[in-house]
């Protein structure tokens, strides 16, 4: 199973004794509505969790098929549906106003999913933090920057939307198991800047590269979450030390 969040959620579900079946794009075409319907109806799952890149039409088709078959459908969105140059934190009912292609794409997915099924679960996620490089998470970003520059330069002014992958996976499981359909925002950052997060990760993982602060005006671009509990960064990160 590929991606950043999917393997973590699959692991969390298996801890609950839930069988997990991956979608093999080499066998089930995502651009063929009949194939999409056939696969879902043959599997007869309780839940379909869509965390992959793909067209909004694919997402909407899955949502529609799930609604017609009484299957819970989850789509993981992103905080990037909001314009990060504007002040936050952003409430769940704020109209998406992304200016970049990725944010607009995810917002379009949301719109088409809701049109296809008002019973869908949509969970917007922030920048995820894993345990090691190797996927699209913050630590991997740090290692790639360190290879390019010999150091990691991060903002000491911007407060990003973040959560640990393990906490996101747990929240997604609880969302499907215990909450009603709707739009949710999973936020795990109590208010740490990216530099503060990086120094705390440095203290935890003992990176072999320096962390350098980049000073800029303070800006809070987190999401507001008052619906579902998400593990906070400060629960897992020690106080930062000078890297």
Regions found by a protein language model. Name each.
Residues 86-123, 130:
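Catalytic helix-loop patch of NAD(P)-dependent Rossmann-fold dehydrogenases
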Residues 19-31, 214:
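A short beta-strand-loop structural module common to alpha/beta enzyme folds
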Residues 23, 51, 73-79, 123-125:
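SDR active-site strand-loop-helix element
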Residues 148, 169-174, 178-219:
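Mid/C-terminal beta-alpha module of Rossmann-like enzyme folds, strongest
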Residues 30-68:
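NAD(P)H-binding glycine-rich loop region in Rossmannoid oxidoreductase-like domains
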Residues 207-243:
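C-terminal amphipathic/interface module of NAD(P)-dependent oxidoreductases
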Residues 114-160, 167:
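NAD(P)-dependent short-chain dehydrogenase/reductase
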Residues 1-16:
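N-terminal Rossmann NAD(P)H-binding glycine-rich loop of SDR-like oxidoreductase domains
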């Amino acid at each position: 199973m590929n991606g950043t969040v999917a393997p973590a959620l699959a692991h969390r579900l298996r801890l609950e004794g839930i069988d997990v079946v991956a979608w093999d794009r080499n066998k089930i075409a995502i651009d063929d509505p009949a194939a999409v319907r056939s696969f879902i109806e043959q599997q007869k799952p309780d839940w379909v969790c869509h965390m992959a890149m793909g067209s909004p039409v694919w997402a909407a088709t899955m949502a529609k098929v799930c609604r017609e078959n009484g299957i819970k459908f989850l789509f993981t969105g992103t905080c990037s549906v909001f314009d990060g140059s504007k002040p936050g934190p952003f409430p769940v009912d704020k109209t998406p106003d992304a200016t970049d292609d990725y944010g607009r794409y995810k917002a379009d997915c949301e719109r088409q999913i809701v049109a296809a099924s008002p019973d869908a679960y949509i969970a917007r996620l922030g920048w995820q933090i894993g345990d090691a490089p190797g996927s699209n998470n913050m630590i991997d970003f740090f290692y790639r920057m360190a290879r390019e520059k010999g150091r990691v330069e991060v903002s000491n002014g911007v407060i990003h939307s973040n959560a640990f992958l393990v906490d996101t996976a747990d929240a997604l499981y609880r969302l499907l198991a215990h909450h009603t359909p709707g739009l949710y925002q999973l936020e795990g950052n109590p208010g740490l800047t990216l530099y503060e997060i990086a120094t705390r990760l440095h203290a935890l993982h003992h990176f072999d590269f320096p962390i350098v602060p980049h000073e800029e005006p303070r800006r809070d671009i987190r999401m507001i979450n008052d619906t579902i509990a998400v593990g906070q960064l400060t629960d897992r990160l020690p106080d930062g030390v000078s890297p």
